[in-house]
Design a protein with these regions (language model features):
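Secreted/extracellular ectodomain signature
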Residues: 1-102
């Protein structure tokens, strides 16, 4: 099956971020043409900042509200969403991305 998939992995906490990272790496290994985004909010934002992941950080988008609440800034390759995570998740789903809560 050669269908290109767009997958958004939602990580709301540290454990979810760990699962999302593993799922992203596994999905891309099995189907390199897949588009994968990890959207981290709440406790997952702090986990992403504190625990770098060379394979998944470039795919990881942080909620600006969670980042501001922590009083921290993100460094590349981590990216910051241009809107709250809840809106980004809804927008991606509206555009056909498959949502998976990690």
């Amino acid at each position: 099956m050669n269908t290109v998939l767009d997958i958004v992995l939602h990580a709301p906490d540290a454990e979810g971020l760990q699962r999302a990272r593993m799922n992203a790496v596994n999905a891309l290994r099995a189907a390199p043409q897949t588009q994968v985004r990890i959207i981290a909010n709440a406790a997952a934002v702090e986990a992403a900042l504190n625990t770098p992941h060379p394979q998944a950080d470039a795919l990881t988008y942080l909620c600006p509200n969670s980042l501001n609440a922590l009083g921290r800034t993100a460094t590349a390759p981590l990216q910051v969403l241009g809107e709250p995570a809840v809106l980004a998740l809804a927008r991606l789903q509206k555009h056909g991305w498959a949502y998976i809560r990690s």
